[in-house]
């Protein structure tokens, strides 16, 4: 679950205040104009920014002041942040062990994660040999390896064409079902999510102004 109670961020250009209640396992889309506060909302939940006041509860624990690594959250950005000199396997390994010195069990987990996103045969490839959609699949698999119950997506597929976006969104829905993930997804294409989202939040001027159920 995700619960934000009067979470205030004193941004110089746009003061923000968020109240939010998302049940465990729900899938939520976040829409709004550029600069409205969508990414800031995710950053507050992930721990990349800290509020001036208010509380952030994640899975029944107060994480208002927790460091990002202490939170039950993984976050995927538009930039896939893959290291070009490392193979797919090594990039995935960074999700669980930065030293890249893996046990047999950890290696098996990496192979399973790669297979879950359709890249089981790409482990020895370098990122520059992958398509944009394949790179995002690697980044998604790395998030899943962290084994966190809350997944935050900040427009990760906006640079892809519509066909690839639809494929990636279908993959996300499948993985959420399999792993019982709670999902928050910032998007500019809410129509592509019809049938796979529990609610849509509209962020305007640093606040959640609307909530639509059952999209």
Swiss-Prot record:
It comes from the Bacteria. The complex is composed of two ATP-binding proteins (ThiQ), two transmembrane proteins (ThiP) and a solute-binding protein (ThiB). It is a peripheral membrane protein. Residues 2-215 form the ABC transporter domain. It catalyses: thiamine(out) + ATP + H2O = thiamine(in) + ADP + phosphate + H(+). Belongs to the ABC transporter superfamily. Thiamine importer (TC 3.A.1.19.1) family. GO terms for cellular component: plasma membrane. This is Thiamine import ATP-binding protein ThiQ. It comes from Haemophilus influenzae (strain 86-028NP). It is found in: Cell inner membrane. GO terms for molecular function: ABC-type thiamine transporter activity; ATP binding; ATP hydrolysis activity. Keywords: ATP-binding, Cell inner membrane, Cell membrane, Membrane, Nucleotide-binding, Translocase, Transport. ATP binds at residues 32-39. Part of the ABC transporter complex ThiBPQ involved in thiamine import. Responsible for energy coupling to the transport system. The keyword Transmembrane helix does not apply. Its EC number is 7.6.2.15.
């Amino acid at each position: 679950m995700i619960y934000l109670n009067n979470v205030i961020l004193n941004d110089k250009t746009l003061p923000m205040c968020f109240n939010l209640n998302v049940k465990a396992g729900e899938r939520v889309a976040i829409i709004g104009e550029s600069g409205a506060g969508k990414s800031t909302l995710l950053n507050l939940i992930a721990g990349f920014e800290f509020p001036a006041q208010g509380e952030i509860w994640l899975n029944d624990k107060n994480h208002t002041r927790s460091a990002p690594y202490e939170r039950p959250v993984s976050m995927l950005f538009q930039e896939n942040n893959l290291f070009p000199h490392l193979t797919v396997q090594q990039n995935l390994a960074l999700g669980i062990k930065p030293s890249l010195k893996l046990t047999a069990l950890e290696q098996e987990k990496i192979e399973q994660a790669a297979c879950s996103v359709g890249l089981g045969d790409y482990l020895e490839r370098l990122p520059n040999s992958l398509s944009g959609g394949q790179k995002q699949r690697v980044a998604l698999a790395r998030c899943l390896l962290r084994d966190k119950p809350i997944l935050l997506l900040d427009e990760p597929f906006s640079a892809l064409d519509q066909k690839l976006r639809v494929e990636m969104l279908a993959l996300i829905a499948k993985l959420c079902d399999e792993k019982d993930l709670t999902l928050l997804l910032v998007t500019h294409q809410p129509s592509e999510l019809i049938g796979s989202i529990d609610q849509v939040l509209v962020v305007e001027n640093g606040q959640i102004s609307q909530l639509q159920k059952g999209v």
